[in-house]
Structures are given as C-alpha cells and as structure tokens.
C-alpha cells in the first residue's frame, strides 16, 4: 500500500512540474507589447498629419501617401533595406514620377527623411532626389552627394527654392556640408539623414541617425537674412513650375523641357529606404523617435 501511495505522489509531482513548465512556456511565448519611443508605437505615428509622401520601396516604387504618383522606374531593383526591402541604385537607375500633388507642390516648410547605404564615388555628384522646375536649371528642391577624397565623409548639398519675385533668381542658394561641416563616417553602412527647413524662422537643420548636427550660424541661419528685402528672412518655401519628381537622378534625366544631363550629373548608386517628406520642420524629439522606430523596424 505504501509503495502504491509513493508511486501516486511521484506521478502527481511529475504532472505538476509538467503543467508548471507548460504555463511558463505559454507566458514566455506571449507577445510582449512594444515600449513606446518618444510617445509613439510606430514610425508612421510621428507627425502623422504632416506626412505628405512616403516611399518604403518594399518591392514597389509607389508613394503610399499618394502625394507623388505615376512612377516609371528605369533599371530599378531592390535589396535588403533597413525595414523590408530598399531601392537599389546604379549608374543608370532612376525613378520618374509624372504627378505631384498640391500637398507637395505647396510646401511652406519641409522635412526630408531617408535611409541610405552608399560607398564613396568619384566623377561628379549623385542625386538622391529632385523636385524639378521647368525653367530653372537647378529645379526647386534637391539633395545630392558630391564625390569626395575621403572614405569616411560625405559632402551633401541641399538646394531649396525661396519665396522671390520673378526678377530675382535664387538658383544656387545651396546649403553645403563640406570642410569642418562635412558629414563624417557616412559610407558603407545604413545611415538615416533628415534635413529640414522651417519657413517661419527661415532656419535649416540636419540630423544623422537621429542626432542633430551642431551647425555654425552661417549654415543654420543661411536664409535668415535676404539682402534684397533689407536683411529680412527669406521666409516660406515657394516651389513653382513643378512638373514631375525624380528619385536617383536629376531633372535633366527626364528629357524635355530640360536639357541633357551634364557629365557631372550622376545617378545615385547606393541603397535608399523609407524616404519621407513632411510639410513641417520636425522637432528634435520627432526626428529621434523616427530614427529609433525605423531602426527597430516599426
């Protein structure tokens, strides 16, 4: 009898341990809620009301916000991105879009965010994107990467069209990151670049991997004093004669009414992912949250 009771006790104890293990496994396998970052659960929540264009390049060239549509890809392919797949550039690749919505055309302030993975190049400047202008060689807005002599730095040049009268040509009003302000350690790995222009304060900011770059006043307030307006600020953006949009090339790659590209005008050869345009200048917290969320594939 004692032996029988002992066997029962052992059997009961074994069953209890097994059930306890099952409970433990179930608890371990239950989804763990994401911790909010900067008050957001995912990247699309950041300044959601101000996101006017978004390209994730998950096997498509479409803008999920439909701010820029009618895309035609030339030699477009994809590779692994920071989040899903990414646009893979080459010496002959670009994407041309035929339709640009008023939400993009009429931007007064702007933030452009993108992830890029690229290598050093020579021979000219690679265009990341461009908002063309029919009668202006430089277009309305663009970002490009100049060739450089260092494998750890990037010479980024941004051009933004200003609110001007027809008699004044502000072509060539570049923000240039070179010399002491060159962007360092940019090649060979994924980097998030975010730049913004605040039309209210006429100030420019740039961030790399969620961190704001400290810029001299000559750059951050590049547009704070307009000599043609008695030293007043340049003010809000004023894109005009907008026709089409291009990723990975220049407006000159689109044909008429633009001429053929100059020899230094190079297609972007790196990877690009999560390209976004906002109609406001994002705050430091918003940029930091966007970086962390996208890096976390959220």
Name these PLM-found stretches.
Residues 6-11:
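Sec-dependent N-terminal signal peptides
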Residues 1-4:
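Positively charged n-region of N-terminal signal peptides that target proteins for export
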Residues 16-20:
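C-terminal motif of bacterial Sec signal peptides marking the signal peptidase cleavage site
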């Amino acid at each position: 009898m004692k032996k029988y009771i002992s066997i029962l006790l052992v059997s009961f104890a074994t069953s209890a341990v097994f059930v306890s293990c099952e409970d433990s496994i179930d608890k371990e396998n239950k989804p763990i809620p994401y911790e909010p970052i900067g008050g957001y659960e995912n990247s699309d929540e950041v300044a959601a009301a101000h996101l006017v264009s978004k390209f994730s390049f998950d096997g498509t060239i479409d803008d999920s916000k439909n701010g820029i549509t009618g895309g035609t890809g030339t030699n477009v392919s994809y590779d692994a991105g920071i989040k899903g797949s990414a646009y893979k550039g080459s010496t002959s690749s670009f994407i041309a879009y035929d339709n640009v919505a008023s939400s993009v055309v009429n931007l007064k302030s702007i933030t452009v965010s993108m992830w890029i993975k690229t290598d050093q190049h020579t021979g000219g400047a690679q265009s990341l994107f461009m908002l063309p202008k029919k009668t202006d060689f430089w277009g309305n807005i663009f970002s490009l990467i100049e060739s450089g002599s260092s494998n750890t730095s990037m010479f980024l040049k941004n051009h933004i069209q200003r609110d001007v009268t027809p008699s004044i040509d502000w072509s060539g009003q570049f923000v240039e990151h070179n010399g002491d302000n060159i962007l360092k350690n940019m090649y060979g790995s994924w980097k998030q670049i975010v730049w913004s222009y605040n039309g209210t304060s006429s100030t420019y900011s740039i961030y790399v991997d969620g961190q704001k770059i400290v810029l001299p006043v000559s750059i951050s307030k590049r547009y704070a004093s307009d000599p043609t307006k008695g030293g007043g600020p340049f003010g809000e953006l004023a894109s005009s004669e907008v026709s089409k949009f291009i990723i990975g090339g220049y407006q000159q790659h689109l044909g008429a009414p633009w001429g053929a590209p100059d020899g230094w005008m190079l297609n972007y050869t790196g990877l690009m992912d999560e390209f976004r345009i906002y109609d406001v200048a994002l705050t430091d917290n918003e940029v930091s949250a966007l970086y962390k969320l996208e890096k976390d594939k959220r």
